[in-house]
């Protein structure tokens, strides 16, 4: 594991207590000074928690169920990724500045790193979370296919880093707890991936109502149909196949991999699971938010 450390920390660095991609923090002033608009909607998640799924659901709500409008461009252009920056290749801030209102903003930032302007303008926010074990599995495969990131080595080694918060965007525990605290504000809707898998209709209606639209049976049906895992996996505008292969090698692992709950059982050996569970209990002992590891 030691041999991977220098390479790993050339790409990622501690930034205000959170491990971040150094390319993102290089121009941090642009993020910090970002000017929100009152009708901006923020979709926040810890990575690999269902970001693309909930983003497409929300976009469908905004477009009143018009599937063709949702297919006009890749989701990473329709809903820019706020802090994402790779010199001039990708610039989430620039994309957002050029967008007409109302904008939908994707971020993986914890609340303390989110531009203050979003709080000052009292923007609505949606936070989607997913159980830690499934996030760890999905994150591992994701890091394998991002060509500019160091190989995460074995799954067990990656889980050790995950538990210590030494993965991009830092500690899952801190991230979830901080957003849970923020959800005391009625402008922040806290949602669970597991709830969406259990009853997507109920959760879509919840989103429509939060966004102050009128839920019709027809609209809900269209959204459910268009945003099913299989539909999105086959849809070039959501499956990230429009992303160049030199950035994302989907031959290593597809961006849309399984989209299920409980896949962690296929990856965690017994001893690792026990260590993870003990660590999880310690980290989450003072937090009232409860997760389901299986349905």
From Swiss-Prot:
The GO cellular component terms are: cytoplasm; cytosol
What result follows from mutating residue 108 to K/L/S/R?
A: Loss of estrogen sulfotransferase activity
Q: What is the effect of changing residue 240 to F?
A: Slightly decreased estrogen sulfotransferase activity
UniProt-listed Enzyme Commission number(s): 2.8.2.4
Q: Where does 3'-phosphoadenylyl sulfate bind?
A: 48-53, 130, 138, 193, 227-232, 257-259
Which GO molecular function terms does the record list?
estrone sulfotransferase activity; steroid binding; steroid sulfotransferase activity; sulfotransferase activity
The observed outcome of changing residue 106 to R/S is: Strongly reduced estrogen sulfotransferase activity. Strongly reduced affinity for estradiol
UniProt keyword annotation of Cytoplasm present: yes
Question: Can you say where in the cell this protein is located?
Answer: Cytoplasm, Cytosol
Primary subcellular site in the record, as a coarse category: cytoplasm
What catalytic reaction does the record list?
Answer: estrone + 3'-phosphoadenylyl sulfate = estrone 3-sulfate + adenosine 3',5'-bisphosphate + H(+); 17beta-estradiol + 3'-phosphoadenylyl sulfate = 17beta-estradiol 3-sulfate + adenosine 3',5'-bisphosphate + H(+); (24S)-hydroxycholesterol + 3'-phosphoadenylyl sulfate = (24S)-hydroxycholesterol 3-sulfate + adenosine 3',5'-bisphosphate + H(+); 3beta-hydroxyandrost-5-en-17-one + 3'-phosphoadenylyl sulfate = dehydroepiandrosterone 3-sulfate + adenosine 3',5'-bisphosphate + H(+)
Q: InterPro entries recorded for this chain?
A: P-loop_NTPase, Sulfotransferase_dom
Q: Where is the signal peptide?
A: none
Lipid metabolism is among the record's keywords: yes
Record keywords? Cytoplasm, Lipid metabolism, Lipid-binding, Phosphoprotein, Steroid-binding, Transferase
Q: What class of enzyme is it?
A: transferase
Tissue-specific expression: Testis and at very low level in the placenta.
Q: Which residues carry this modification: Phosphoserine?
A: 156
Residue positions of the active site: 108 (proton acceptor)
* Superkingdom: Eukaryota
Q: What is the activity regulation comment for this entry?
A: Inhibited by estradiol.
What is this protein's function? Answer: Sulfotransferase that utilizes 3'-phospho-5'-adenylyl sulfate (PAPS) as sulfonate donor to catalyze the sulfate conjugation of estradiol and estrone. Is a key enzyme in estrogen homeostasis, the sulfation of estrogens leads to their inactivation. Also sulfates dehydroepiandrosterone, pregnenolone, (24S)-hydroxycholesterol and xenobiotic compounds like ethinylestradiol, equalenin, diethyl stilbesterol and 1-naphthol at significantly lower efficiency. Does not sulfonate cortisol, testosterone and dopamine. May play a role in gut microbiota-host metabolic interaction.
By sequence similarity, the record places it as follows: Belongs to the sulfotransferase 1 family.
Q: Quaternary form?
A: Homodimer.
Task: Quote additional remarks.
Answer: Abnormal high expression in liver in obese and diabetogenic C57BL/KSJ-DB/DB strain mice. Female > male. Normal level in liver.
Protein name from the UniProt record:
Sulfotransferase 1E1
What species was this sequence derived from? Mus musculus
Q: What is the lineage of its organism?
A: Eukaryota, Metazoa, Chordata, Craniata, Vertebrata
């Amino acid at each position: 594991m030691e041999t991977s450390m220098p390479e790993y920390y050339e790409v990622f660095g501690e930034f205000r207590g959170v491990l971040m991609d150094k390319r993102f923090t290089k121009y941090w002033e642009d993020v910090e000074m970002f000017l929100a608009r009152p009708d901006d909607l923020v979709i926040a998640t810890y990575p690999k928690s269902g970001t693309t799924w909930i983003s497409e659901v929300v976009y469908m709500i905004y477009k009143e169920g018009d599937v063709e409008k949702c297919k006009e461009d890749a989701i990473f252009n329709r809903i820019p990724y706020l802090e994402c920056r790779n010199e001039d290749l990708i610039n989430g801030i620039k994309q957002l500045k050029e967008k007409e209102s109302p904008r939908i903003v994707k971020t993986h930032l914890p609340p303390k790193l989110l531009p203050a302007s979003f709080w000052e303008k009292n923007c609505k926010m949606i936070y989607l979370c997913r159980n830690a074990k499934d996030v760890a599995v999905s994150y591992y495969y994701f890091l394998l296919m991002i060509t500019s990131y160091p190989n995460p080595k074995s799954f067990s080694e990656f889980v050790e880093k995950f538990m210590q918060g030494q993965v991009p965007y830092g500690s899952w525990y801190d991230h979830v707890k901080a957003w849970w605290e923020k959800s005391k504000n009625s402008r922040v809707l806290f949602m669970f991936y597991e709830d969406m898998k259990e009853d997507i209709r109920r959760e879509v209606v919840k989103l429509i109502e939060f966004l102050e639209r009128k839920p019709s049976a027809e609209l809900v049906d269209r959204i459910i149909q268009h945003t099913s895992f299989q539909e999105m996996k086959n849809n070039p505008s959501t499956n990230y196949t429009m992303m160049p292969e030199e950035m994302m090698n989907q031959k290593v692992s597809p961006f849309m991999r399984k989209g299920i709950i409980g896949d962690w059982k296929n990856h965690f050996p017994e001893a690792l699971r026990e260590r993870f569970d003990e660590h999880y209990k310690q980290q989450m002992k003072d937090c009232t938010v409860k997760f389901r590891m299986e349905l």
